[in-house]
Structure formats: structure tokens, C-alpha cells
């Protein structure tokens, strides 16, 4: 069983955005990254697409939703500022029901999920934090993540 954790694609400068941050959209670069992520995961057997409520996260999953015919579900536990254990537990509950989830979240939540999983015994292959549009492929066995593989962003940004 797999869980795919995706950091949202490039959304431009937070400081240059003068509206509510959760409404900040993807940049043209981010749109390209989102398409590349979708191409990489289109045949990964994903059953559900989970997103933070933030627009940039939802937009990151739109090309994957189009490729798979799935709807993007907003999951509050993935919102920026949330903690790792509740997000990880929600993802593991879905995996326990046999669902493969691709979840898009933020640069604080994703590393917190990874840190929680490694504290619980998962082996991490790659960095603890990834750049925008980077992702982790998590292997689940016996109700826990056992292995986490970091996949760099599709445009090679580090």
C-alpha cells in the first residue's frame, strides 16, 4: 500500500501577495510542475486526492484529478500550520481501508508527517524537507509507514 505526499507546486512570493494567503494561486511555473506531477502519478493506482484548503494545494492536484477522473477532496488536517501526527493518522486510516491517497499540503505539514513517521520507525530515503512540487512515496505495511522515498520536484529545483 502506498501514500503519496506532495508539496504544493510553486505559487510565487508570499510577501508579494497582498490578499489572504490561502487564496494564493499557482504561478505559471507551478502549473507546469503540477502537470508534471500528474504525469508521474497518473498510473500509480491512486484512489483519492486529498488537499489542504489552500488554493495552491488544490490547484496542484487538478491535473492529476483530470488524469485519473477523481475529485479533489479538501481535508482540513492538511492545512498549513497543522501538526504531523493527526495528518499521518488520517492517511494511515485511509490506507488501512485499502485506499491509496495522494495528499497535497505545505512545507511545514509534509515534513511534520515525515518526522512523525520516522519517529514511529519509518526509514527515510532522501531529505526531511522537499522543495515545492517535490513529493514522497510512502510504503505502508502493518498499519505504519515503513519506507519513505523522496522524489525531487519535476523541474529539478532543490
Predicted segments with their positions:
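Short, solvent-exposed coil/turn elements at secondary-structure transition points
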Residues: 9, 78-80, 141, 151-154
Amino acid at each position: 500500500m502506498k501514500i503519496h505526499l506532495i508539496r504544493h507546486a510553486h505559487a510565487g512570493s508570499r510577501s508579494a501577495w497582498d490578499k489572504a494567503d490561502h487564496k494564493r494561486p499557482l504561478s505559471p511555473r507551478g502549473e507546469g510542475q503540477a502537470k508534471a506531477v500528474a504525469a508521474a502519478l497518473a498510473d500509480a493506482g491512486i484512489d483519492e486526492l486529498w488537499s489542504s484548503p489552500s488554493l495552491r494545494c488544490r490547484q496542484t492536484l487538478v491535473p492529476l484529478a483530470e488524469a485519473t477522473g477523481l475529485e479533489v477532496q479538501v481535508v482540513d488536517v492538511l492545512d498549513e500550520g497543522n501538526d504531523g501526527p493527526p495528518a499521518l493518522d488520517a492517511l494511515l486510516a485511509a490506507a488501512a481501508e485499502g485506499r491509496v491517497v495522494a495528499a497535497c499540503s505545505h512545507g511545514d505539514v509534509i515534513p511534520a508527517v515525515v518526522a512523525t513517521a520516522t519517529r514511529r520507525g519509518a526509514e527515510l530515503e532522501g531529505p526531511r524537507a522537499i522543495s515545492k512540487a517535490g513529493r514522497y512515496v510512502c510504503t505502508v505495511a502493518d498499519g505504519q509507514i515503513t519506507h519513505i522515498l523522496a522524489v525531487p520536484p519535476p523541474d529539478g529545483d532543490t
